[in-house]
Amino acid sequence: ILIDPPRSGLTNDIIDLLRLFKNIIYISCNPDSYLRDLTMLSDYEIKKIEVFDQFPNTDHLEIVSILTKKNY
């Protein structure tokens, strides 16, 4: 499943729903909410992560990661 939440990140209901999937492609524009959400998705591991500076000379960036459920 592919998710691209708002800057505020994921809600608890969405995180519960995501746990039904083996793989998640997570796109984020906010490192703080991304880290918070990853903490709640601790039963997943990061298989790949890339950071894109799509807006040079600003503080904005995009994080794209592939998460896979541990022990699936």
What role is predicted for each listed range?
Residues 1-72:
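Rossmann-like S-adenosyl-L-methionine
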